[in-house]
A protein has these predicted regions:
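Intrinsic N-terminal pre-sequences and regulatory tails
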Residues: 4, 28-30
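Hydrophobic alpha-helical targeting segments used for export or membrane insertion
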Residues: 10-16
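C-terminal motif of bacterial Sec signal peptides marking the signal peptidase cleavage site
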Residues: 17-21
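First exposed extracellular module after export/assembly in secreted or surface-exposed proteins
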Residues: 32-216
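Bacterial N-terminal signal peptides that target proteins for export
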Residues: 1-10
């Protein structure tokens, strides 16, 4: 298991564990359909998906305990659902907690001075009030620093502009490490009645230094 990433902003760094679990698991899916998504733990038996569905764990097999609010990547098989389609009873095939950070408000000078070493981006998407990412970075032995910044003086502009930062801390060349993470944006996206444009600038090794836009 990789332990090579700190997630946060310029003002706080929290050491986290990246995917996957230290214990290798072999899962026989048979002919079942299975689904993989990032969800939020509600209690030891329930998760909330980003589209509002309640996912209830009906089998203790492959079950892990998570704290309410944890972001978790789960692979599950659907066993049944209620008449409304808003509540699933599932069997967990595997799961793993993923890093959760917050947007750090700072100034333009700090943003321009921050390291933006490239990552190999798989995808970036907005789910509920979370910005989610899947990517690879080259990790060997030194903890990298990762964060999401915005200029505090421009919070009222039509578009909330955010900047993804990545500092390898001179980690020697190593191996591609696959990672998922989420940033909680609810503190800055406070008004659910008002549509807000948001963008995130990410320096990538496969697409260049690119800006991705979303509507919240």
């Amino acid at each position: 298991m990789n332990k090579g990433v700190g997630i946060g902003g310029m003002f706080f760094i929290v050491i986290v564990s990246f995917l996957f679990s230290c214990e290798e698991k072999t899962v026989d899916y048979g002919f079942d359909n299975y689904y993989v998504e990032i969800v939020t733990a509600q209690n030891e038996n329930e998760f909330l998906s980003d589209n509002g569905k309640i996912i209830v764990v009906s089998s203790s097999k492959n079950k892990n305990n998570y704290t309410a609010g944890d972001r978790v990547l789960i692979n599950y098989t659907l066993l049944s659902e209620d008449a409304s389609g808003d509540r699933y009873n599932v069997r967990i095939n595997w799961s793993s907690k993923i890093p959760l950070g917050k947007l750090s408000l700072t100034n333009d000078s700090t943003i321009n001075a921050s390291a933006v070493e490239p990552i190999f981006l798989e995808s970036v998407w907005l789910g509920r009030n979370y910005l989610n990412m899947s990517f690879y970075l080259n990790y060997r032995s030194i903890t990298h620093s990762i964060g999401l910044l915005a200029d505090s003086m421009r919070m009222e502009s039509d578009t909330l502009r955010m900047y993804f930062i990545h500092d390898s801390k001179n980690d020697p060349p190593g191996y591609p490490s696959h990672a998922y993470l989420s940033f909680d944006l609810k503190d800055v996206l406070r008004n659910p009645e008002k549509t807000r444009q948001i963008s995130i600038q990410i320096n990538t090794s496969n697409f260049g230094n690119k800006i991705y836009g979303f509507e919240y």
